[in-house]
UniProtKB/Swiss-Prot annotation:
Belongs to the universal ribosomal protein uS10 family. Gene3D superfamilies: Ribosomal protein S10 domain. The keyword Ribonucleoprotein applies. One of its GO terms (molecular function) is tRNA binding. It comes from Bacillus subtilis (strain 168). It comes from the Bacteria. This is Small ribosomal subunit protein uS10. SMART domains: Ribosomal_S10 (SM01403). Pfam families: Ribosomal_S10.
């Protein structure tokens, strides 16, 4: 029989909230008896937006804004039913995007 694995990808703009959420997930999974690998930091995605400061002319005067998306990967190997139930009841901050693959 093949090993079961739950793969959780977390995304957030703030890395502190992301790390706190990852620690909550790892702690919950370990408490319920599953083995955990991670959190693995994935490359940070950086989007840069350049806009003109002036409305009408002065093209040389520009302003740049950037948005960084931090990502983490957590693998839960051989999860028990208690692990899945505990993860479903876990309350995480609203700034974290969670993607779960079974």
């Amino acid at each position: 029989m093949a090993k079961q694995k739950i793969r959780i990808r977390l995304k957030a703009y703030d890395h502190r909230i992301l790390d706190q959420s990852a620690e909550k997930i790892v702690e919950t999974a370990k408490r319920s008896g599953a083995s955990v690998s991670g959190p693995i930091p994935l490359p940070t995605e950086k989007s840069v937006y350049t806009i003109l400061r002036a409305v009408h002319k002065y093209k040389d005067s520009r302003e740049q804004f950037e948005m960084r998306t931090h990502k983490r990967l957590i693998d839960i190997v051989n999860p028990t039913p208690q692990t899945v139930d505990a993860l479903m009841r876990l309350d995480l901050p609203s700034g974290v995007d969670i993607e779960i693959k079974l």
